[in-house]
């Protein structure tokens, strides 16, 4: 700890980030890492044995292709086959009509690249067009490197083998031989979330970060999509299982902030918590067996009173609703999403995005051809890889690519100087490469915030030490050239994406926040009563709120990287946005607490007050886009005598008023958090 205290704050934050990423627990991560690791070693063995070129490209296919579950791996493998046909076909067309004419070749390749980048952003199968764009621009380097058309054709045909045999390999490993099914990952994930919930129910633990809670909720939703596509039994009983996922998410996120020591430890409360934990354990056992859980628990009057006293009544109701739900309930028909985004042909940003990518590639190609420096062809690949919809995400990808390339270059340098002279055969080579590939595979299976570092590290290492050589290599020039090519491409892309039609999210962020607060207002309008339909709607919208707040958080991080904005305005926007996100999360949990007390009352007394809260929140959200939002001030009216039996409800609603008053005032020249107390609210 003393060593960390002596380090600069940015270094400490970087170390904390990598610790979080490398220690991430995710169902399916270990099998995916092992599959990727074994696949990389097999690719090296096969490529070296049969002298197949472009080993780095084969490794890249594996890193992009092997996914967290068998269904996703199979789906990506099919896309890769289609992409290989399209990309090789486009290359042959370019070579046929313009092999000896670089200008004509670029004129033909340019529209292909633009079309691919446009479709990558607007089409559901954007990964296919991304692969075609990569090969279309990479293939322009073949005629420049070689003067013999026959050799270029052979290299292009080799690209078919290089792309397809790793695809076959990952299908055998990840789909046929050692499949990791989404259904088993879902069972494990649900049980892990319930284990965390029980721990917070029985012990006084520090709450987990809200960002982690939201990511876990989104991970369950993604697994649910894969289970629907991959498992017939899950599809048959999908309504029950989707309700199970929503219930587990609610229990997990709510108990994360639960502190059992803040309530009196009466015998009735202790027994109720034990009973609730026992029911959760029964649900876990049913999930492990892959069965729909049915409960015969009927809450007695004393248990209901104990649940209300320890603020667990709503959790109890959601659990019982799941246990009494018919497993054969017909699912709600899901709307099929369109293949293209709605504004694909009306929003000029998509075409501008394609033009910017083409411009960056042409600048790099001109420099690459002008200096006649064959080794820096990675600059053009970099322009395509780091091309993202907005400035912030492009900078994020640039940092990841540069970081991965730097680590890969350092490893390649050490490998060439210290290890390569001592190697005599392929077995020794595989033993030395094994820890490098294992590290890259583990990083590549982390979250999207850092996974590309692992991919880029291994690809850069392979480009510098294993590319098109089938024996010991001691040329350090390759390491220098690949790294410089990536740096050149990163610099050119940064300049283009910053100054040519920059797509800033600074204006989109307030709209995103308004959408999240609008969903929160919908939650407040749902009748607070023990009714199945209302409860299910409440849980589903609550999951949507997790996704909305997480998206706003990620957008804040991207806006922080947009250096073309005024620094003071950017800092003010980020500070206000983070305050809204924080207060929105607190409002959601505070509103959960009002449900526990309001359920015991006649619901007819509640809609007016709930509507008052929702109206104030909608008014605040409506002014975010124009920066006209002020902190809502809500006055609570006198409590009717019929509600005096539950004074806790009044205190909880007063707390909601305080949270409303702490929302930032967007009309102020500087962010001054509201410290004054809301009218009608008490501390």
From Swiss-Prot:
Protein's membrane topology: Multi-pass membrane protein
Key word Cell inner membrane present: yes
Keyword Transcription found: no
UniProt subcellular location: Cell inner membrane
UniProt KW keywords: Antibiotic resistance, Cell inner membrane, Cell membrane, Membrane, Transmembrane, Transmembrane helix, Transport
Pfam families: FUSC
Residues that span the membrane, as ranges: 43-63, 75-95, 100-120, 125-145, 158-178, 402-422, 426-446, 457-477, 483-503
GO BP, sorted A to Z: response to antibiotic
Quaternary context: Could be part of a tripartite efflux system composed of MdtN, MdtO and MdtP.
UniProt-listed PANTHER family: MULTIDRUG RESISTANCE PROTEIN MDTO, P-HYDROXYBENZOIC ACID EFFLUX PUMP SUBUNIT-RELATED
Task of the protein: Could be involved in resistance to puromycin, acriflavine and tetraphenylarsonium chloride.
Name of the protein described by the UniProt record: Multidrug resistance protein MdtO
Organism the protein comes from: Escherichia coli O157:H7
Gene that produces this protein: mdtO
């Amino acid at each position: 700890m003393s060593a960390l205290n002596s380090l600069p704050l940015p270094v400490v934050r970087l170390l904390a980030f990598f610790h979080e990423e490398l220690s991430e627990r995710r169902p399916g991560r270990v099998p995916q890492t092992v599959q990727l690791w074994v696949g990389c070693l097999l690719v090296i063995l096969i490529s070296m044995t049969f002298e197949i070129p472009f080993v780095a490209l084969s490794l890249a296919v594996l890193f992009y292709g092997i996914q967290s579950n068998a269904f996703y791996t199979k789906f990506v493998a099919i896309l890769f086959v289609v992409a290989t046909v399209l990309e090789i076909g486009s290359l042959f067309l370019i070579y046929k009509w313009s092999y000896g004419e670089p200008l004509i070749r670029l004129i033909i390749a340019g529209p292909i690249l633009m079309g691919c980048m446009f479709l990558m952003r607007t089409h559901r199968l954007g990964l296919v067009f991304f692969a075609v764009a990569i090969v279309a621009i990479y293939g322009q380097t073949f005629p420049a490197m070689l003067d013999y058309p026959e050799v270029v054709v052979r290299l292009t045909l080799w690209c078919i083998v290089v792309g397809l045999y790793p695809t076959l390999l990952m299908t055998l490993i990840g789909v046929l031989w050692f499949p990791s099914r989404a259904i088993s990952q879902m069972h494990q994930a649900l049980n892990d979330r319930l284990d965390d919930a029980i721990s917070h129910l029985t012990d006084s633990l520090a709450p987990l970060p809200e960002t982690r809670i939201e990511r876990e909720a989104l991970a369950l939703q993604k697994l649910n999509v894969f289970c629907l596509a991959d498992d017939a039994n899950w599809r048959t009983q999908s309504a029950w299982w989707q309700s199970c996922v929503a219930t587990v998410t609610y229990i997990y996120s709510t108990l994360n902030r639960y502190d059992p020591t803040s309530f009196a430890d009466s015998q009735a409360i202790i027994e109720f918590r034990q009973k609730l934990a026992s029911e959760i354990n029964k649900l876990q056992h049913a999930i492990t067996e892959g069965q729909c859980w049915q409960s015969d628990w009927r809450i007695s009057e004393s248990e209901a009173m104990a649940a209300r006293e320890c603020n667990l009544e709503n959790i109890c109701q959601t659990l019982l609703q799941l246990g009494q739900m018919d497993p054969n309930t017909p699912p709600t028909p899901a709307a099929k999403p369109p293949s293209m985004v709605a504004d694909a042909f009306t929003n000029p940003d998509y075409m501008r995005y394609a033009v910017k990518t083409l411009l960056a590639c042409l600048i790099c190609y001109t420099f690459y051809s002008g200096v006649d420096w064959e080794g820096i062809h990675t600059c053009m690949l970099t322009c395509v890889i780091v091309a993202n919809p907005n400035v912030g995400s492009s900078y994020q990808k640039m940092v990841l690519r540069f970081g991965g390339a730097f680590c890969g270059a350092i490893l390649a340098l050490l490998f060439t100087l210290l290890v390569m002279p001592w190697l005599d055969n392929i077995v020794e080579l595989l033993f030395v490469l094994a820890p490098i590939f294992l590290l890259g595979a583990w990083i590549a299976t982390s979250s999207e915030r850092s996974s590309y570092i692992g991919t880029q590290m291994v690809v850069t290492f392979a480009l510098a030490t294993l590319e098109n050589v089938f024996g010991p290599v001691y040329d350090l020039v390759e390491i220098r050239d690949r790294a410089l090519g990536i740096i050149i491409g990163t610099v050119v892309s940064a300049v283009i994406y910053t100054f040519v039609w920059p797509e800033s999210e600074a204006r989109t962020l307030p709209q995103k926040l308004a959408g999240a607060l609008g969903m929160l207002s919908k939650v407040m309008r749902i009748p607070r009563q023990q009714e199945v339909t209302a409860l299910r709607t409440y849980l589903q919208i609550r999951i949507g709120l997790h996704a909305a707040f997480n998206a706003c958080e990620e957008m804040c991080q991207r806006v922080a990287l947009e250096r073309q904005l005024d620094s003071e305005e950017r800092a003010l926007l980020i500070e206000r946005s983070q305050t809204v996100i924080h207060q929105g999360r607190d409002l959601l949990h505070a509103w959960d607490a009002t449900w526990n007390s309001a359920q015991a009352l006649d619901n007819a007394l509640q809609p007016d007050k709930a509507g008052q809260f929702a109206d104030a929140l909608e008014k605040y959200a409506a002014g975010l886009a124009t920066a006209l939002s002020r902190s809502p001030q809500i006055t609570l009216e006198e409590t009717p005598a019929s509600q005096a039996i539950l004074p806790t409800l009044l205190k909880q609603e007063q707390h909601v008023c305080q949270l409303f008053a702490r929302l930032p005032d967007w009309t102020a020249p500087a962010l001054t958090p509201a410290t004054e107390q809301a009218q009608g609210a008490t501390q």
